[in-house]
Curated annotation (Swiss-Prot):
InterPro entries: Amidase, Amidase_CS, Amidase_dom, AS_sf, GatA. This is Glutamyl-tRNA(Gln) amidotransferase subunit A. The active site is at 82 (charge relay system), 157 (charge relay system), 181 (acyl-ester intermediate). It comes from the Bacteria. It comes from Bordetella petrii (strain ATCC BAA-461 / DSM 12804 / CCUG 43448). Keywords: ATP-binding, Ligase, Nucleotide-binding, Protein biosynthesis. GO terms for cellular component: glutamyl-tRNA(Gln) amidotransferase complex. It is an enzyme of class 6 (ligase). Heterotrimer of A, B and C subunits.
Amino acid sequence: MTTSPLHTRFGGIAELRAALAGRQVSARELARSALDAAQAAGDLNTFLHIDPDLTLAQADAADAALAAGTAGPLAGVPIAHKDAFVTRGWRTTAGSKMLEGYASPFDATVVQRLQAAGAVSLGKLNCDEFAMGSANENSAYGPVRNPWDPNAVPGGSSGGSAAAVAARLVAAATGTDTGGSVRQPAALCGVSGIKPTYGTVSRYGIVAFGSSLDQAGPLAPSSRDLLELLDPMSGFDPQDATSLETCDGAPNAPGRIRAAYDAAQAACDAAGSQPLKGLRIGVPQEYFGAGLAPDVAAAVEAALAQFEALGAQRVAVSLPRTELAIPAYYVIAPAEASSNLARYDGVRYGHRAAEYADLNQMIARSRAEGFGDEVKRRILIGTYVLSHGYYDAYYLQAQRVRRLIAQDFQRAYAGQCDVIMGPVAPTVAKNIGDNRDDPTADWLADVYTLGVSLAGLPAMSIPAGFGNGGRPVGLQIIGNYFDEGRLLAIADRYQQVTDWHRRVPGQQGTEQ
């Protein structure tokens, strides 16, 4: 990337907000600079849809609100949205030819809320087709390249979001996490990302993959930046049947996560030189087995040692069904995907084949032409496990395993530990094309993230150093239900004494 966007001169989102409020820079200047940077970084293939007129109109509205004293907390902050969120104005494809050219008549709730907070969108970010993938190689519009090494994958499915943040094209981005699709690309691109508790952020307007698993979450350089997006994103939404009205007795509303974050930070301040004194970090033995690469293990161990230096206590815990999360997830998620994607038939919307003899052939050809190989693979698996004679043997059994996995986490939290930490992925980013002939290799790489998703727990990834080839390593921090605020505060304490989150591709050691 040859152009450094203007927003990188001001630090994080809080500092950028102060600069905008103090008229040191305008929202239009930030937007114009970010648009230029995105164009200059076209080789990364992070953006699918950019409309400068729409972006600059939002920036002008932010400037007007700042001048009038009515600006929201994100007024003028340049962000971008994963192409799994429907947006009015920008096309929504979910990385698929099936939705090529689709124009949504409405915005997803997450998009609405961030726009109401004043954020300025640069457009839509590349992702694996229908969010199915761990490398962002399944997009119908080409793979995203990792800013740390253009030969490497960025992770998926929110690879465009992670790469755009790593390259500092935007101050933050939205993503979705079904089985690790925020955490894993955040780890492989050296940025921070969080998947909140299932039901705390609206799914309305997210192109559905696995409805009992999908959850929206932000990606940004730091934990503090994540807070600035996650808090206004969250809250009950009557348009989402899975949205929670309360979180452990407290209203599910903007302000909940920030209040918990502030309380956790106050407790850290009161603890003095060891701000995390009393925090019990559970380290699952199953996360450090033979499948974990030595370079990743070393980086994670160093991060854990840093947390101990901050006063935390490391305790051994067991999550005995960690490996069972893989087959359970790859039964449940494809089953839900096959149901959700049944609506794409070439009749109501989506790709329609140009030539067909009858209705059945039209539907068959439209789906064959519109869906990519990985999506077809998961539809076939899902249809099979839901079919008569196999439902009990596969889908019902997978749901039972899912319940047992959730119980494993609760046993760990019931008296043993406060948070769980470990790796996000077993290796650093692979090269593009490495797993082309073995698609299940990407599935196995999700071993540390899938259980969290099946249990519906909050978890985040933060930068924790570099492994082989100078490729980033992420540390996963897993909390109990509704612990987002505390997770963000714990991560911030680590980031106050380390600088991994400030490292920028090509500019190591510099901040944003």
